[in-house]
UniProtKB/Swiss-Prot annotation:
It catalyses: glyoxylate + L-alanine = glycine + pyruvate; (R)-3-amino-2-methylpropanoate + pyruvate = 2-methyl-3-oxopropanoate + L-alanine; 3-oxopropanoate + L-alanine = beta-alanine + pyruvate; 2-oxobutanoate + L-alanine = (2S)-2-aminobutanoate + pyruvate. The modification N6-(pyridoxal phosphate)lysine is found at residue 350. Multifunctional aminotransferase with a broad substrate specificity. Catalyzes the conversion of glyoxylate to glycine using alanine as the amino donor. Catalyzes metabolism of not L- but the D-isomer of D-beta-aminoisobutyric acid to generate 2-methyl-3-oxopropanoate and alanine. Catalyzes the transfer of the amino group from beta-alanine to pyruvate to yield L-alanine and 3-oxopropanoate. Can metabolize NG-monomethyl-L-arginine (NMMA), asymmetric NG,NG-dimethyl-L-arginine (ADMA) and symmetric NG,N'G-dimethyl-L-arginine (SDMA). It is found in: Mitochondrion. It comes from Bos taurus. The gene is AGXT2. This is Alanine--glyoxylate aminotransferase 2, mitochondrial. Residues 1-41 form a transit peptide. InterPro entries: Aminotrans_3, Aminotrans_3_PPA_site, PyrdxlP-dep_Trfase, PyrdxlP-dep_Trfase_major, PyrdxlP-dep_Trfase_small. Its main location: mitochondrion.
Length: 514
């Protein structure tokens, strides 16, 4: 290879690709057919960092049989990334292995869930010990682990957030938080941002404001959307707005301690309060950083003023920490702390159990009592001994291995490296995030900020997978790549991931030029 592209590829230390991937095989033949990555248009890939783990030999269903069963017996709503879905077999720390033994760097961690690494030995050991001791009792009988875990978790939250309700998923946690807010306030209306994702239950669908999750059926009575203070796509935003090492390319004349964008978005929030809800409201839900919408950050100071306005109307403020909690943002253990606010209710899931089904709602004694006066709340599996054993081990690993600090250091390192790609490639419109919660928004061009067509984003996504990197998708048009690896990720692994992404962008530009 000669010319500018050859020089660029050589500078990335790229080498011939030896990874093999499955050819699209929805014809369901008796065996899977295989093709080299050169059939995908890829000729080179960055060198993977070493891994001192050998996966077990895959001995389960044939790939073609998996596709057949999926088509016949699993709901069609169970969709997968890529035309030839990965059949994953084993995990080790940051790595995943498919049924052919191919290795992938997991930079999405099961949708921001595997917080301390796949099959962490301490978490595994805790689960194995409890498996031989006691699986389930329900909350009508006491067991020590739920009490030990509640004490550990509440110690990580500021006063007066000290009462813990354990459930099984983020949707369940937000469902319960909605009940608490309405029981405590004696009001109905709850506000959430456009672009918010708070769950897919019939109740939380009212809070979720992403079109693909909406149905033409009654749901979420009393839920009111409000403008998301999105400083990249919204009407206001500039170069000092975000709490991030990387700012938007939009320019502004604001002084560093003054944000006109924040003031304008607060006026929109006031307008919602004045026109769209009752004089007394039940509450306001907010993710500290929007996840499903593509890692959207708000102007600094916005949530603090919004919380004050909600409380003036008698509402409670709920922080949805399902994706942002447990040290992922680096500078603080909880996302709400990065906004200098104190919520009345905090919901959490995903990283709480490193992939084990577990979630929690933490609130104040007064709000907890309000629910008790209204109803008997019961959850069969919430707080079961297995979940509490796993959850306790996860908290211990985060502390012992300094994973919050690692999120800050390695996340900042990655953001700054990705920002250089934004400056280099016209189709990389924005790089944003904090710690190990990062978004890369793909655009037609930086001036229009219009989303890159889905088929082009799909191809870049697929090319990354072909080179051994798994990343997520988000945004209203699926135009944003979401990066949220386990918090034990290292700088050499970041270097590999950034080189892969850059190579995928180069491949895309070569295709465009043909």
């Amino acid at each position: 290879m000669t010319g500018a592209w050859g020089h660029l590829l050589r500078s990335l230390h790229l080498k011939t690709l030896s990874l093999w991937i499955p050819k699209t095989c929805f014809s369901l033949k008796a065996r899977a057919f295989w093709t080299s990555v050169t059939r995908c248009g890829l000729h080179t890939k960055p060198s993977m960092p070493p891994c001192d783990f050998t996966p077990e030999r895959y001995q389960s269903l044939a790939y073609s049989r998996v596709l057949e069963i999926h088509k016949q017996h699993l709901s069609p709503v169970h969709t997968a990334y890529f035309p030839e879905p990965l059949l994953l077999h084993q995990g080790h720390v940051e790595w995943l292995f498919d049924h052919e033994g191919n290795r992938y760097l997991d930079f999405f961690s099961g949708i921001v869930t595997v917080s301390v690494g796949h099959c962490h030995p301490k978490v595994n050991a805790a689960a194995q010990r409890q498996l031989g001791r006691l699986w389930h009792t329900s909350s009508v009988f006491f067991h020590p682990l739920i009490h030990e875990y509640a004490e550990k978790l509440s110690a990580l939250l500021p006063e007066p957030l000290k009462v813990v309700f354990l459930v099984n998923s983020g949707s369940e946690a937000n469902d319960l938080a909605m009940l608490m807010a309405r029981a405590h306030s004696n009001s109905t209306d709850i506000i959430s941002f456009r672009g918010a994702y708070h769950g897919c239950s019939p109740y939380t669908l009212g809070l979720t404001n992403v079109g693909i999750y909406k149905m033409d059926l009654p749901h979420g009575m009393g839920c009111q959307p409000t403008m998301c203070p999105d400083i990249f796509h919204g009407p206001w935003g500039g170069s000092h707005c975000r709490d991030s090492p990387v700012q938007t390319i939009r320019k502004c004349s604001c002084a560093p301690d003054c944000c006109q964008a924040k003031d304008q978005y607060i006026e929109q929030f006031k307008d919602t309060l004045s026109t769209s809800v009752a004089k007394s409201i039940a509450g306001f839900f907010a993710e500290p950083i929007q996840g499903v919408n593509g890692v959207v950050q708000y102007p600094k100071g916005f949530l603090k003023e919004a919380f004050e306005l909600v409380r003036e109307r008698g509402g409670v403020c709920i922080a949805d920490e399902v994706q942002t909690g447990f040290g992922r943002l680096g500078s603080h253990f909880w996302g709400f702390q990065t906004h200098d606010v104190l919520p009345d209710i905090v919901t959490m899931a995903k990283g709480i159990g490193n992939g084990f089904p577990m979630a929690a709602v933490v609130t104040t004694p007064d709000i907890a009592k309000s629910l008790t006066k209204r109803m008997l709340h019961f959850n069969t599996f919430g707080g079961n001994p297995m979940a509490c054993a796993v959850g306790s081990a996860v908290l211990e690993v985060i502390k012992e291995e300094n994973l919050q600090e690692n999120s800050q250091e390695v996340g900042t390192y990655m953001l700054l490296k990705l920002a250089k790609l934004r400056d280099e490639f016209e189709i990389v419109g924005d790089v944003r995030g904090k710690g190990l919660m990062i978004g890369i928004e793909m655009v037609k061009d930086k001036e229009s900020r219009q989303p890159l067509p889905r088929e082009e984003v799909n191809q870049i996504h697929h090319d990354c997978k072909c080179m051994g990197l798994l990343i997520g998708r988000g945004g209203l048009f699926s135009q944003t790549f979401r990066i949220a690896p386990s918090m034990c990720i290292t700088k050499p692994e970041v270097d590999f991931a950034v080189e892969v992404f850059r190579s995928a962008l180069i491949q895309h530009m070569e295709r465009r030029a043909k």
